[in-house]
Amino acid sequence: RYSTVRNLASPSLNANGPHVSDPRSGEIIESDINWYHNVMKLLRNWYFVQTAAVNPEARGVEFKNEVMGELIRFVSSHEFGHTIGLPHNMGSSSAYPVDSLRSATFTKKYGTAPSIMDYARFNYVAQPGDDGVALMPSDWGTPNVGVYDIYAVKWGYKPILDASEDEEKEILRSWIREKEDDLMFRFGPSGGIDPSSQT
C-alpha cells in the first residue's frame, strides 16, 4: 500500500526494487527498495574482485566510508530504476569496446556501461598502467544514469499530448527506429540466451 525503503535483517547479500502495477494500465501504483543487511559485504566483494588489480583502495579489509557510500549510492540508484519499471539491461555491458574502457577520457565521460540497469558496476577491464581510468561511479559522476536509462525513461514516461492512440504508437516506434543501430541503446534481458548480454 505504501512505497518504502526497507532495511531487512537477513543473511542475504542482495538489494531489490519490486513494484506493483495496475494490470489494466501498466501504471506503477506501489514500489519499494529492499536493502538486505549484508548487501555491503557483496559490494565489498564485487569492488575487490573487479578493481583490485589496478586499485590499491579496493585491497583493504575495510573500505573508507566515502568509498562504501559511493557503492551504496550506485546500487540504490539501480534499484530505484526497478521501482519505476526499468528491467535489467544486460546488453548494455557489451556496448563499449575494450580500448574505450581502458581510456581515462572515455570512462570519465561515459562510465562502464550506458545503463545503470546492467551489472557492469565497476571497470573490471582496466589494467595496470591505464592511468586515470575511471573504476567506480564517483570517478565519472555518481550515479551513472546512462544514456540508455534516460532514453528508456523518456520512452516510458514522456507525455505525448494531442495524439491519438495510433499516432502515439507510431511516435514510440519512431523513437526506437532512431536508436536501433546504436549499441549504446541496445537492450538485453538477463537470462543467458544472448552472449552479448555479458553480466
Residue locations for each model-derived region?
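Conserved catalytic/binding loops enriched for acidic/polar residues
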Residues: 93-199
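Alpha-helix termini
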Residues: 39, 43, 91-94, 98
